[in-house]
Design a protein with these regions (language model features):
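Short, structured coil segments at secondary-structure junctions
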Residues: 53, 75-77, 85, 152-154, ...
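Active-site phosphate-binding/coordination module
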Residues: 38-128
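Short, acidic/turn-prone active-site loops that include or flank metal/cofactor-
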Residues: 84-88, 216-219, 233-237
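Short acidic-hydrophobic, aromatic-tinged amphipathic segments that line or gate anion-handling sites
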Residues: 227-232
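Conserved acidic, metal-coordinating active-site core of Asp-based
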Residues: 119-208, 212, 216, 220-222
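Non-catalytic pre-domain segments flanking phosphatase-related domains
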Residues: 1-29
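Asp-based phosphoryl-transfer active-site loop
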Residues: 19-40, 205
Length: 249
């Protein structure tokens, strides 16, 4: 099917929900750049699809946990969340919250970064980090090389999600979070499909059976994906759903 063909037959929103077969796999989906538009607002067309997904739906994001938890709530879905790039794993059905990471080391990195004259780039209210439990995020407007150097000195790593630089433990990832959450749910993590757009989705792609990058994805996500959608952002997610439908029809 060509891009033009797919654009002509790609249903959106409520129309697409009527075409979702029960045989669709469990899904792990990113938020920023995947369910949103370029303005970072949620694309309203993705909401009914996520709400009606016939299998398990996991929200896997670099955001702190209040954001994906709220998204699950407003979608009317069970709270199944991988937050902070795998640092926080929440399973509502089994009443489990697990934390992995080194928040003290992340704080030490930021303090050393500031001591060298740099800032995190956020306003004093810092709603980006206020609720973080396992990592810290620095604005992409701040210099990256010194941040990477200081993080390495503390045994941490920096992941560029395209929206922020995340200072985190190297052994924490969305992919490992998916394995943990799938275990809680007694599901095979390799049965999942995954949709994302960024370097921090690569580990999820490596675990999932089907990995789809939206058209605005960075090079790392594109290289790790099985498919890359013709469309970008939220429209790319709908395109990914179309591809998943084709794979089970």
């Amino acid at each position: 099917m060509t891009r033009d063909d797919r654009e002509m037959c790609l249903p959106a929103g409520e129309e697409l929900t009527e075409l979702l077969p029960d045989s669709l796999p469990p899904l792990a989906v990113d938020i920023d750049g995947t369910l949103t538009g370029p303005d970072r607002g949620l694309d309203p067309r993705v909401m009914p699809v996520c709400r009606s997904w016939p299998s398990t739906l996991v929200v896997a994001t670099g955001k702190s946990m209040p954001y994906p938890v709220a998204l699950c709530e407003f979608l009317g879905r069970e709270t199944l969340v991988i937050a902070e790039n795998g640092g926080v794993v929440i399973s509502g059905p089994t009443e489990s919250i697990q934390f992995e990471g080194s928040p003290e080391k992340a704080q030490a990195v930021v303090e050393a970064y500031r001591a060298e004259g740099y800032t995190t780039g956020w306003p004093e209210t810092d709603l980006i980090n206020r609720w973080r439990e396992t990592e810290l995020a620095v604005s992409r407007e701040s210099p990256l090389p010194p941040l990477e150097r200081i993080a390495d000195e503390h045994g941490l790593t920096v992941v560029d999600t395209g929206y922020a630089y995340h200072v985190k433990s190297p052994d924490v990832s969305k992919g490992q979070g998916l394995r943990t959450l799938a275990g809680e749910l007694e599901l095979d993590p390799e049965a999942f499909a995954a949709v994302g757009d960024s370097q921090n989705d690569v580990s999820t792609f490596e675990v999932a059976k089907r990995a789809i990058a939206v058209g605005n994805a960075d090079d790392a996500a594109r290289a790790a994906a099985d498919r890359v959608t013709a469309e970008t952002y939220g429209a790319g997610f709908l395109d990914a759903v179309h591809l998943l439908r084709e794979s089970v029809d």
